[in-house]
């Protein structure tokens, strides 16, 4: 049996992203999303989650992305830049973390605060993942999985896309190498999660083409979907031009949203006997 979790990241980051995710859920086949508890529009996202109780909701642990922490800046200063925000990306964070400049006590306190903020919102949390996949980095993954067990969140994203998978997406060698490194870290994280009795999808898609998916590329993934539970990570939103002026990632938010509204892809789900599910299917 083929099952697919279509998980929209960055819920709570911006109203146009929130609106795109909900549109993709109500009118398309997005089945799950990941709430950023420290993001500027997280309260709007919580309200939308409460209005759409069948939408799977994960916690998108955030240690990067130039957003503010949940805890006061003075309590987690080793995680932040001079403006009191998280570092811009995983590369900057990894350099600081592996140089020994991040205090483990501050890291754990902030991750706990993010999980607890989501739990206090009274929404059913289906899983844990993270912004730019920092939760699978060696040295952080063990802490995150410990917290999963402690807070009884028994499912986790494992972003282990197959090393050779392209799905028709053409890119440079640098992106391929980056994906390979992440998949290797995710493979180690999967082994650790399995040893702790945590659950995760068997397959993962959407890494190499992250932020650049469209109807054709999603269709290619559906055509090649293996048996079992697969996660497809996506980043839908409304008005790519407006979002592109705010965020530097050059994502194609509108195209990603349209991929799940596309009538051809909806028919493909039926033709391939693919069941849309959320993380509770793991």
Language-model segment annotations:
Residues 130-132:
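Active-site histidine-anchored catalytic micro-motif
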Residues 2-5, 15-127, 139-282:
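Terminal accessory/targeting
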Residues 8-11:
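DG-centered beta-turn motif at the end of beta-strands
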Residues 135-137:
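Active-site pocket-lining segments that scaffold enzyme catalytic pockets across diverse folds
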